[in-house]
Regions:
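Conserved pre-motif I regulatory segment
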Residues: 173-220
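Conserved helicase motor "Helicase C" RecA-like lobe of SF1/SF2 P-loop NTPases
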Residues: 655-680
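Metal-dependent nuclease catalytic cores that hydrolyze phosphodiester bonds in DNA/RNA
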Residues: 1-78, 108
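A contiguous, basic/glycine-rich beta-loop/short-helix subdomain that forms a polymer-engagement track
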Residues: 334-359, 369-376, 502-622, 629-632, ...
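Mg2+/Mn2+-dependent nuclease catalytic core
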Residues: 57-154
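A substrate-engagement module of RecA-like helicase motors
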Residues: 178, 185, 243-359, 367, ...
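Signature of the SF2 helicase/ATPase Hel1-core->accessory helical subdomain module
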Residues: 231, 237, 258, 341-358, ...
Length: 827
């Protein structure tokens, strides 16, 4: 029997953790601050103190061989010659309330490390020391207990005996899982064209010899071939061969999570003996069973019965779920279990994930530096990553590593705090004055209406004279300054320093006044401050600082222009990663921005008959901003020709809501007999579903929907058959020119000379190709794609067309379009 690998912390917390979920403000970033203080205490201990000592040992309980491992915070020999295991804990608990028996888990960790080290070194006795560091007062309290090795070994053995039934359950499951996955058959009678090739690529990536940074694969596969099953099936087969312990299916939106759930359900339906546990991770706000009056989770034991006593009941809930035999733990199943056992569904799904084989969730569970799953990704593991709709990852990753802070947050906090003097009020005022001076500096550097710009001094700094109320402030040299926005390559330390100084008094106030009326507003401010300060710690040459003056407000953004090193680091936590989409063109662009320059990239051709797709372009229409007014009428005429060619459902995609609205108003005035439907901004899930329901099969009347490229209907929508028989794409999808996009352009111009491509052309054409992919979804589908813009005839854009667009026809005018459409539908 293979040894059961068991981290010390997992063993101790699983068995001994008790009590409730309590998300009240604790005053510090536990992970980052705790690690910093650990290093501080370890360094202060001096010579002879060994820090972060890796320990591993073999033990047996109930016939199960265990490998127990972990890192002891410190090991040293005291003046009496006794070996001491030091366990360091950082706490916000007031020093007077810190007790020796405050947390049994703390002693247990030290005692297990003592057992491992004692046997390893042949010691007869050891001491275990708990070192508590109080983060507000810097008080250090230490407690020491004396043990014989025999006592420590007995303690560890007792823990293992308690854990053994859980280990046995998991070992039996893994054996059963391995047998079933190795024999898993493809759940359909035959592969669709292209599916076998895609599955083969993914299987080879997952079973390749592990490397330090993991194997990377980029797969472009046409819409409609069944990508979800084509990547899931081979990855699961790889796990069946022993290549991979868990599979993480990561998505950009909920709709693709459902696709993964459905694919796994299909595998279960086709194989009644399939042993597979899957869990879908859903945001806390969406699964909360006991929100407060404003609809937000209230994770306090005195307010939520599902938080109160959670750790006392969660293992009972886990046992019931793991033994129920279904293995499918989606949102509905978890809600039922949470109600049955009175446990928080969000924390339950996280705890359950450690016992599951497939984990389905948003990108942020792997890539976001704040909310990623530390239990899996703080160190590398035998994980397989499937990244769906990977064309969305560059922008999502940029957003995850960026941060913003507004002066208005300080103003609102001051207002909420009210009158009176306090340390916090003073710190708020200093930060507010710094941002006020920053706003004035930006307004001078980047005047909106003809004001003269300031000049740099010899140091490269921009200095502005202040006043008694508003002191002078220095900003780094501006790399870009226009229309109220300034970009700097260096951090604006003059703005960040007062925010850093605000942290301590803000923490103190939040801890001391938890019931104050202003608590919610100041807690929001605290998190905003922490967010921007964390981003400042990551800040390097891949970032730019954006300062924007809007009226009386100043917005500071630390923008991640290039997320490649951060994505690379996240993917390195696993064995292999397959990133797939219908649109990963050009592949070099995606490999570069996602930190995988050496990754293998494959592009599969469309399996669908070319004659089923009518593909036309009217290059006589220009949708450039200056020609938009002149383009409205010709676009309406082209849309009318498309929608009148055959009764059915159509979609027209535009680069913006404003442009959409202009054309829609003209179209409905001139073609009132054609039914229309407009995508409104900010649609929720219900609104999205209602919109799509209008695209019914076998329509008796024509419906023309107006949507936005890159929006919720421009991708991730499956309208097969005659639910959608045509779409028009207005423009080449270029992002709107903005200071941010210009900084992206400048950055990549400096990197590789392709700034316009990286910032505008390639992201825009991705939206075009995604929108066009809504039309042909199955082998039997027949439909039309109409391109409306003269730039589609330019080689820089045409070279980005997929191979199955070789038959694209460029037409002279609407009259010729009508004839082509008539002929297409007559065939």
């Amino acid at each position: 029997m293979p040894a059961f690998r068991l981290p010390v912390r997992q063993l101790v917390e699983f068995l001994l953790r008790t009590g409730s979920i309590d998300s009240r403000f604790t005053g510090f970033d536990r992970a980052n601050e705790g690690a910093r203080i650990h290093r501080k205490l370890q360094k202060a201990a001096g010579e002879g103190y060994a820090a972060e000592v890796f320990l591993s040992g073999e033990r047996e309980a109930a016939g199960i061989p265990f490998t127990i491992e972990g890192r002891a915070d410190g090991i040293f020999t005291d003046e009496a010659g006794v070996t001491v295991i030091d366990e360091i804990k950082t706490t916000a608990v007031p020093a007077d309330d810190i007790a020796e028996d405050m947390n049994p888990c703390h002693w247990a960790q030290g005692m297990v490390y003592g057992a491992l080290y004692g046997r390893q070194q042949g010691l007869e006795k050891l001491d275990v020391r708990l070192t508590y560091y109080q983060i507000d007062t810097d008080d250090i309290l230490r407690f020491v207990r004396h043990f014989t090795l025999e006592e420590l070994e007995a303690f560890l053995q007792d823990l293992l005996e308690q854990y053994a039934p859980w280990a046995q359950r998991q070992l039996a499951w893994k054996e059963r899982r391995g047998v079933s996955l190795s024999a898993l058959d493809f759940p359909f009678p035959a592969y669709r064209p292209g599916q076998r090739a895609l599955a083969g690529e993914v299987y080879r990536a997952c079973t390749a010899a592990p490397s330090k940074s993991g194997v990377r694969l980029f797969c472009q596969a046409p819409t409609g071939i069944g990508k979800t099953m084509s990547v899931l099936f081979p990855a699961l087969r790889a796990i069946g061969t022993g290549c991979g312990e868990k599979l993480f299916y990561l998505t950009a939106r909920n709709t693709t999570q459902s696709a993964a759930e459905d694919a796994i359900a299909r595998l279960r339906a086709s194989d009644s003996k399939l042993a597979l546990r899957s869990v879908t991770l859903t945001a806390k706000e969406k699964v909360c069973l006991h929100p407060d009056a404003e609809g937000h989770p209230a994770c306090l034991p005195e307010l939520c019965p599902y938080a109160n006593g959670y750790y006392d009941r969660v293992n009972t809930a886990l046992k019931a779920l793991l033994d129920d035999g279904t293995g499918r733990f989606d949102r509905a199943a978890l809600a039922d279990a949470a109600k049955q056992f009175t446990v928080c569904p969000f924390e339950l799904e996280l705890d359950l994930s450690e016992w599951c084989d497939v984990i389905i969730g948003d990108y942020n569970y792997l890539f976001d530096p704040v909310v990623h799953l530390r239990r899996f990704f703080d160190s590398a593991g035998d994980w397989l990553f499937l990244v769906d709709e990977a064309h969305n990852l560059p922008e999502r990753a940029r957003a995850m590593y960026s941060a913003r802070f507004c002066k208005s947050s300080l103003t609102e906090a001051k207002r909420a705090l009210g009158r009176g003097k306090s340390t916090l009020k003073t710190a708020l005022s200093k930060a507010d004055k710094a941002f006020l001076a920053g706003r004035k500096a930006v307004s001078t550097l980047a005047p909106r209406r003809g004001s003269t710009a300031a000049e740099e001094d010899d140091s490269g700094q921009t200095s502005l004279l202040g006043s008694a109320e508003t002191p002078a402030i220095e900003l780094p040299a501006a790399d870009y300054a226009q229309d109220g926005t300034v970009f700097c390559k260096e951090l604006p330390s003059a703005l960040l320093a007062p925010l850093r100084a605000l942290t301590a008094p803000l923490q103190d106030w939040l801890e001391d006044d938890p019931d104050a009326e202003a608590h919610a507003a100041l807690l929001d401010l605290y998190f905003e401050v922490q967010d921007i300060l964390r981003a400042s710690e990551r800040y390097d040459e891949h970032f730019a600082a954006q300062l924007t003056a809007r009226g009386s407000d100043l917005e500071l953004q630390l923008l991640c222009l290039d997320p490649s090193p951060f994505v690379d680091a996240s993917l390195s936590a696993g064995r292999a990663a397959a990133l797939f989409s219908a649109t990963l063109t050009p592949p070099g662009y995606y490999r570069t921005v996602l930190g995988c320059p050496e990754a293998r990239a494959v592009a599969l051709e469309s399996p669908f008959p070319a004659e089923n797709l009518g593909l036309y372009c009217l290059p006589s229409i220009s949708t450039r901003y200056r020609q938009r007014d002149a383009s409205i009428r010709p676009i309406s005429d082209a849309l009318a020709a498309l929608a009148s060619s055959r009764v059915g459902n159509y979609l027209a995609f535009f680069p913006s809501y404003a442009y959409l609205r202009q054309v829609w108003e003209d179209f409905t005035a001139r073609y009132p007999d054609i039914g229309t439907l407009v995508q409104e901004s900010g649609l929720d899930d219900a609104g999205r579903a209602a919109f799509l329901e209008r695209f019914s099969p076998c329509p008796e009347k024509t419906l023309l929907g107006f949507g936005v490229m890159g929006g919720i209907f421009g991708e991730g929508v499956d309208l097969a058959g005659d639910r959608l028989i045509g779409c028009a794409i207005v423009g080449v999808g270029l992002p709107q020119v903005s200071p941010r996009q210009e900084m992206l352009r400048r950055y990549y111009d400096a990197q590789n000379g392709a700034g316009f491509d990286y910032a505008y052309r390639w992201p825009g054409m991705n939206k075009v190709l995604q929108a066009a992919g809504r039309v042909i979804r199955t082998q039997e589908d027949k439909g039309v794609v109409l391109l409306l813009d003269d730039r589609f005839a330019q080689s820089e854009y045409a070279r980005l067309f997929p191979k199955h667009w070789r038959h694209l026809e460029y037409l002279r005018d609407t009259k010729e379009l009508k004839k082509k459409l008539e002929d297409f539908w007559a065939e």
